[in-house]
Design a protein with these regions (language model features):
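Alpha/beta-hydrolase superfamily serine-hydrolase fold, recognizing
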Residues: 1-183
Length: 183
């Protein structure tokens, strides 16, 4: 959040349009982008025009169907997710805190429009899709896409598969972000 707030204060010298600030992240970065969006709303700024969440972890305290069914053999395992969660919050008992698990926020109303991309064979798929549903229910404009045949991390491998390249450059991400921050 502090980096985003700093960027907003430095937008003019950097030649940025403060009406078109967006946050984006994949995996843990998607979790952080969701959290930054929540903090920006709760703290009265900076105003964000868009959030892009690519296979985000949104519930470190839960156990979704995809987490159970895809817990092994799909690049990202449930054991790895638990370990990442422990590194993130330690043994503080904060896994259910909405700033750690955005899906558990009491309200998502007033957040910026979002693109949420999930991967078919990702243990985090269901919680990412549940977050998109909660955003939509809160009146937030959402583009939500499940990338069929994809594993967690595919956006970091755009040349590994034509599907990843298409998702990033054309279908979901490029079009949504262009509408939000460029046009």
């Amino acid at each position: 959040y502090a980096a985003t707030a700093w960027l907003a204060t430095q937008a003019k010298p950097l030649g940025l349009d403060t009406q078109r600030l967006a946050v984006c992240g994949d995996s843990a970065g998607g979790t952080l982008a969701a959290t930054v969006s929540m903090l920006a709303k709760d703290r009265g700024g900076p105003r964000l025009s868009y959030q892009v969440l690519i296979y985000p972890g949104t519930d470190f305290a839960g156990q979704s169907t995809s987490m159970r069914e895809l817990s092994e053999g799909h690049l990202l395992s449930a054991a790895m997710i638990r370990w990442f969660g422990e590194c993130y919050v330690g043994e503080t008992g904060q896994a259910a805190n909405p700033l750690v698990s955005p899906l558990r926020a009491p309200s998502l109303a007033g957040l910026p429009p979002a693109t949420v991309i999930t991967a078919e064979y990702d243990p985090l798929r269901d919680e990412g899709e549940a977050y998109a549903d909660r955003l939509r229910e809160a009146g937030v404009s959402v583009v939500a896409r499940r990338s069929l045949g994809m594993l967690h991390g595919f956006a970091s491998m755009p040349y590994a598969t034509p599907v990843a390249d298409r998702v990033i450059a054309e279908d979901h991400l490029g079009e949504s972000v262009t509408k939000a921050v460029i046009t």
